[in-house]
Curated annotation (Swiss-Prot):
The gene is Rlbp1. Its main location: cytoplasm. Interacts with DEGS1; the interaction increases synthesis of chromophore-precursors by DEGS1. Residues 136-297 form the CRAL-TRIO domain. Soluble retinoid carrier essential the proper function of both rod and cone photoreceptors. Participates in the regeneration of active 11-cis-retinol and 11-cis-retinaldehyde, from the inactive 11-trans products of the rhodopsin photocycle and in the de novo synthesis of these retinoids from 11-trans metabolic precursors. The cycling of retinoids between photoreceptor and adjacent pigment epithelium cells is known as the 'visual cycle'. SMART domains: CRAL_TRIO_N (SM01100), SEC14 (SM00516). This is Retinaldehyde-binding protein 1. It comes from Mus musculus (Mouse).
Length: 317
C-alpha cells in the first residue's frame, strides 16, 4: 500500500485567526459606507486574499497587465475596444483595480468587465448623458433607491427599494436607474465596498396590479443589464420581501434575463422574514423594512452623497 502524496502549506496563526474572525463579524466590524476607505480592516484584507486572490505584491502587476491589454485590444481598431481605451485613458490605477477585484484578479475577465461597463453606457446613454445633479438628488431624497448608513455583518452595502409609494408619473423608471448608477459609481470608490460588495432589498408591500402592468420588459431588462457585467461590483444577494401573489408575473419576465450566478443569489421571502433577518440584522433596517430604526429618510443619504443643500449646484455629470 503506497503512501498518499500531496502538498500543503503551513497557515500562519494570524491568518487562521483572521479567517475565524470572518465567521463571527457584526455590523460594527466594518468601516463607513460613505466616503473613501482610510484603512481596510485586517479581516477584509484576508477576505480579499481568500475570495479574490488578492495579494499586495501583485496588485501593481495586475493593473499594468490590464493597461497593456487595453492598449493591445485597441490596436485592433475594433470600435468597442477603442471606446474602452478612451474611457480608461484619464483614469488612475485605482479605477482599474475595481475591475480586477470584481473578477478575482483574472486580468482577461477584468477586461471583459471593462468592455461591459463601457458597452452599457453606449447602449443606454439616457442613463448617463446630461444628467441634472438636482434631479438626481431629488430622486435619491425620495428613496429611489435607498442606502443604509451601516454595512451588514458581511461588510456589504445594503441598497433599498420600497415600491409602495412609487408612481412612475412622478419618478420614471429611467430616473430610478440613473440614481442607481450614480450611487454605484460613488460607493465603488470605497475599497471596502469593492471587496465586500452589495446586497439589495426590494420591499414589494403595497405593489399594485397597476404598477405591475406598467413595468415594461425593456425596462426590466435594462435593470438586469445594470446588475450583470456592467459595473465592477459584487452583487452578493437580492432579497424580495412582502411580495403579493401577482409578483410572480413580473418576476417571470425578469428571470430569463438573469444568468445562473445572479439567479442563485435571489431570495423571495414573502411575509415570512425569519430567513431574511438571519442575513440582514433588524437593528440596521428602518421600520418600513421590518427593522428597529426610524422610517427611511432619503434626505440623510442625499446629504452624504451631495453635501448640504446650500452647496449643491445644478450641473451635469
Amino acid at each position: 500500500m503506497s503512501d498518499g502524496v500531496g502538498t500543503f502549506r503551513m497557515v500562519p496563526e494570524e491568518e487562521q485567526e483572521l479567517r475565524a474572525q470572518l465567521e463571527q463579524l457584526t455590523t460594527k466590524d466594518h468601516g463607513p459606507v460613505f466616503g473613501p476607505c482610510s484603512q481596510l480592516p485586517r479581516h477584509t484584507l484576508q477576505k480579499a486574499k481568500d475570495e479574490l486572490n488578492e495579494k499586495e505584491e501583485t496588485r501593481e502587476e495586475a493593473v499594468r497587465e490590464l493597461q497593456e491589454l487595453v492598449q493591445a485590444q485597441a490596436a485592433s481598431g475594433e470600435e468597442l475596444a477603442l471606446a474602452v481605451a478612451e474611457r480608461v485613458q484619464a483614469r488612475d490605477s485605482a479605477f482599474l483595480l475595481r475591475f480586477i477585484r470584481a473578477r478575482k484578479f483574472d486580468v482577461g475577465r477584468a477586461y471583459e468587465l471593462l468592455k461591459g461597463y463601457v458597452n452599457f453606457r453606449l447602449q443606454y446613454p439616457e442613463l448617463f448623458d446630461s444628467l441634472s445633479m438636482e434631479a438626481l438628488r431629488c430622486t435619491i431624497e425620495a428613496g429611489y433607491p435607498g442606502v443604509l448608513s451601516s454595512r451588514d455583518k458581511y461588510g456589504r452595502v445594503v441598497m433599498l427599494f420600497n415600491i409602495e409609494n412609487w408612481h412612475c408619473e412622478e419618478v420614471t423608471f429611467d430616473e430610478i436607474l440613473q440614481a442607481y448608477c450614480f450611487i454605484l459609481e460613488k460607493l465603488l470608490e470605497n475599497e471596502e465596498t469593492q471587496i465586500n460588495g452589495f446586497c439589495i432589498v426590494e420591499n414589494f408591500k403595497g405593489f399594485t396590479m397597476q404598477q405591475a402592468a406598467g413595468l415594461r420588459p425593456s425596462d426590466l431588462k435594462k435593470m438586469v443589464d445594470m446588475l450583470q457585467d456592467s459595473f465592477p461590483a459584487r452583487f452578493k444577494a437580492i432579497h424580495f420581501i412582502h411580495q403579493p401573489w401577482y409578483f410572480t408575473t413580473t418576476y417571470n419576465v425578469v428571470k430569463p434575463f438573469l444568468k445562473n450566478k445572479l439567479l442563485q443569489r435571489v431570495f423571495v421571502h414573502g411575509d415570512d422574514l425569519d430567513g431574511f433577518f438571519q442575513e440582514i440584522d433588524e437593528n440596521i433596517l428602518p421600520a418600513d423594512f421590518g427593522g428597529t430604526l426610524p422610517k427611511y429618510d432619503g434626505k440623510v443619504v442625499a446629504e452624504q452623497l451631495f453635501g448640504p443643500r446650500a452647496e449643491v449646484e445644478n450641473t451635469a455629470l
